[in-house]
Amino acid sequence: MASTLDRSIHHIDNFIDLIWLEKGLSPNTLSAYRQDLVSFNLWLKGKEIEAVKKADLLDYLSFRLKEGYSSRSTARCLSSLRAFYNYICAELNLADNPTAKIDSPKQGHTLPKVLSEDDVEALILAPNIDDPIGLRDRAMLEVLYACGLRVSELINLNLLSINIRQGVVRVMGKGKKERLVPLGEEALSWINKYLEEARTSLSVDNINDSALFLSKRGKAMTRQTFWYRIKEYALKADV
């Protein structure tokens, strides 16, 4: 049975997927969001995220300031929590948003960096396609952006999800609802290249994994592994 923290992390990761897709935030900004939210949930010491009240948030913000965090950092943290609870209230049908009517510290904070089209292009071009892992990552990024998938949807694709002839991918979304998404010529081309030149070298004889995108151990990619790779490419591409 999943722990309270595990369930909270699941909600956090789904939220991060959503804002990356909807807002196009840079990997560094997304990492900061996630760190803010995970730190808060660790501080809660097992309290359910849906049980959090305004008083809990005020106590946490006070704790941060007493620990020496700057007003700028605390304002950013509150911004992360506000966005997260807007998502959670909609996701879990909660009536009361605990971040409502909480004022940010007076000092301003810089706006999160949003990826431009050039940034996205640089990120997609960052993997070394002469390497099987890099070729896999290039195909994943092409599919992610061409189809507008969440990371969780991307890593859950299997070989039967792709219809090469029709050029579509079958995606299992929220509530186990399926949808067909056109791949586009570029993404389809990279999937074909990955399947022909890289996937076989990543598969392991004694592991029969039908996942489309395999890790170097021949198993399905995890969200954590994908984000680690993205952060590396973001540094390489300077985005």
What is each residue range found by the language model?
Residues 1-239:
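Conserved catalytic core of the tyrosine transesterase superfamily
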